[in-house]
Amino acid sequence: MEVPPQKSAPGSALSTARVLGGIQRPRHLSGFGFGSDGLLGSPERAASSSPVTTLTQTMYNLAGLGSETPKTQVGSLSFQNRLTDLSLSRRTSECSLSSESSESSDAGLCMDSPSPMDPQTAERTFEQAIQAASRVIQKMQFTIKASVFASEAAGHSPVLQNITNSQALDSWEKDEAGYRAASSPGEDKENDGYIFKMPQKLPHSSSARALAEWASRREAFTQRPSSAPDLMCLTTDGKMDVEEASPVAQSSSLTPVERACEEDDGFVDILESDLKDDDMVPAGMENLISAPLVKKLDKEEEQDLIMFSKCQRLFRSPSMPCSVIRPILKRLERPHDRDVPVLSKRRKSGTPLEEQQLEEPKARVFRSKSLCHEIESILDSDHRGLIGDYSKAFLLQTVDGKHQDLKYISPETMVALLTGKFSNIVEKFVIVDCRYPYEYEGGHIKNAVNLPLEPDAETFLLKHPITPCNLDKRIILIFHCEFSSERGPRMCRFIRERDRAANDYPSLYYPEMYILKGGYKEFFPQHPNFCEPQDYRPMNHAAFRDELRNFRLKTRSWAGERSTTQLCSRLQDQ
């Protein structure tokens, strides 16, 4: 049935000349040009174009008007894909309509027939479609903000971030598939107004409870330290500070009124459904993620670990605690699920823990120690202050001399000894004059014995040693020569060497011996009264050169014989 076309005034807002399906668009819409005589410009242009070309251009402009608005470009990528699918479906319908219009034009039908739809109804339907598209853009922006908030809350834990991303991707794919399934059944629905269907909103109390549960469950991930030292050193105050700074705590601290003020439009309920899916995570996996890295042992457990390897105890670090050392057996207890007697083996070594705990600690054996006070005092004391047998200290006052291993006395001490000041302690003293005979005859100290050669001194002192009648008194030997620099010290060392060889260590015949400092040359000028004759004859006297030569030869020959004899004795001992 054909309806006669309605003529519109030139200044009206709508033109019904060339509109498909009765949908009219207002003139005040931006981005779409209207002519003075219709939808696409002047009547001259409409007359020059064929009806099929005019219809194709009209449908193309109608499809582009709703798909490329500035607000649509701000929307998400998925929404653009949906609008692209709609435009493609519209273009498909345009092609089909163009083919039908060509057939109708061939049959003599006019495509400029008026639409049966009322112009006001068409304008209202068009405005509703535009408003629905703007609401879709706003809701998608809110969804993007919610996903960004969830990613920031899960930023402290990579595991939580992966779980949240995977769940969000699954839910988004499900929504996308449902939308495509709903929009695919028929192509005739493209002319209907696209109205965004709001999701069913659950009660507000359930969303608040879900947010609180989500915040408490994710608290373990956000507060988990990144390393074991941070975990051990983290205090209660530090944990409170981290909780206050976390975005999850800030979001959960909002009051119900503040949350009600925020227009969630049901998208928080989607997040609640994702949280319910997290309940399917096994308890063991949740413990692995949220449990502390280091386990603290109780005192009872530390006491139970008693059996350790001795080698590990010996070579372990001193700062390492004993509880860290591995036990001898890898498994302290036998498995209870094996009751077959064939599989059970007898332990080769080791005692039960109860018997080992009852054992008393063994007494440690220390190094033996001598309790002899005298020997300890002798060994601990300085040997240089004791006489040869280490039994007593030196009686006479000593002075520093040329040889540090020998004891020197001054001429004044010699005079005190000659005058008998030490008679109560000294039973007998012997003054050994080591000079040559012509020197001794020229002048010597009273009661001195001339022993120029070592064999003579050995025969006189060691073949028939002098022994004290009273054990509390001492026997003292005093050696000197012209200067007490060479012959006197050499004779003193010789007598000590022979005395050591003749007695068991540390016993000696003559443990106390001295050297007269300065010799006879220094003693005679100071105390000539204790010399007889009171004269001094030097060793290199011109009248006694031959005697000096002879005694030197004897001394050297005897020294050579002694060295040869000692060498032969050493060879025989080997």
Curated annotation (Swiss-Prot):
One GO location term (cellular component): cytoplasm
Broad EC category: hydrolase
Keywords: Cell cycle, Cell division, Cytoplasm, Cytoskeleton, Hydrolase, Mitosis, Phosphoprotein, Protein phosphatase
Activity control: Stimulated by B-type cyclins.
SUPFAM superfamilies, per the entry: Rhodanese/Cell cycle control phosphatase
Primary site of residence: cytoplasm
Modified residues (Phosphoserine): S42, S166, S246, S319, S349, S370, S557
PROSITE patterns: RHODANESE_3
Keyword Transferase attributed: no
Biased composition (Low complexity): 90-105
Reactions accelerated catalytically: O-phospho-L-tyrosyl-[protein] + H2O = L-tyrosyl-[protein] + phosphate
GO MF, any single term: protein tyrosine phosphatase activity
Function field: Tyrosine protein phosphatase which functions as a dosage-dependent inducer of mitotic progression. Directly dephosphorylates CDK1 and stimulates its kinase activity. Required for G2/M phases of the cell cycle progression and abscission during cytokinesis in a ECT2-dependent manner. The three isoforms seem to have a different level of activity.
Domain of life of the organism encoding this protein: Eukaryota
Family stated for the protein in its record: Belongs to the MPI phosphatase family.
Active-site residues, record numbering mapped to chain: C481
Compartments (UniProt record): Cytoplasm, Cytoskeleton, Microtubule organizing center, Centrosome; Cytoplasm, Cytoskeleton, Spindle pole
GO BP term (any one): oocyte maturation
Protein name: M-phase inducer phosphatase 2
Post-translational modification: Phosphorylated by BRSK1 in vitro. Phosphorylated by CHEK1, which inhibits the activity of this protein. Phosphorylation at Ser-349 by AURKA might locally participate in the control of the onset of mitosis. Phosphorylation by MELK at Ser-166 promotes localization to the centrosome and the spindle poles during mitosis. Phosphorylation at Ser-319 and Ser-370 by MAPK14 is required for binding to 14-3-3 proteins.
Stretch list, region Disordered: 31-51, 90-110, 339-359
Entry's EC annotation: 3.1.3.48
Annotated ranges, domain Rhodanese: 425-532
Assembly and interaction partners: Interacts with MAPK14 and 14-3-3 proteins.
